[in-house]
């Protein structure tokens, strides 16, 4: 299991990432911005997600500026940060990568918004695609954590619909990534995570029929 998945958002970042100056600064800035936010899956500190994305990119051999963008990839969507803040602190390349994987909230409708995001990422280059893949791996893992609550919790129909929409987006994202980054270990890892999720869906469907 990745080191990142054990830190609970409270311990120091791994030594391997501390040696990357831009990443180190980005992780600390992200922790400040995401303070008090929690993950939907399990109520853990939200910072676990960008930390995991950064670590996945590090393991895949991404350069410092891409890993830093991984740490910051949700700050435009989920905090008060604006692109100018990122350009000032981390440079235009990091800011552009974060923007490439940030949704346009002006687009109404889940499917339309996610479709626009995939097109945006596809046009943003290989580094943005790597970042997008790492994000989807982490999100797929979170969706797996949610499965128990979806199966047993209140509001089951709404939760099931949301899960189906998210899984469809992840599958379409995988298809894009397989086309653009066919040899990336991140893409292979995403495929494995989605296979695991699909098996869980099949098991729940069989249980419901019985």
Q: What residue spans do the PLM features occupy?
A:
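Active-site helical microenvironments for divalent-metal-assisted chemistry
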Residues: 1-210
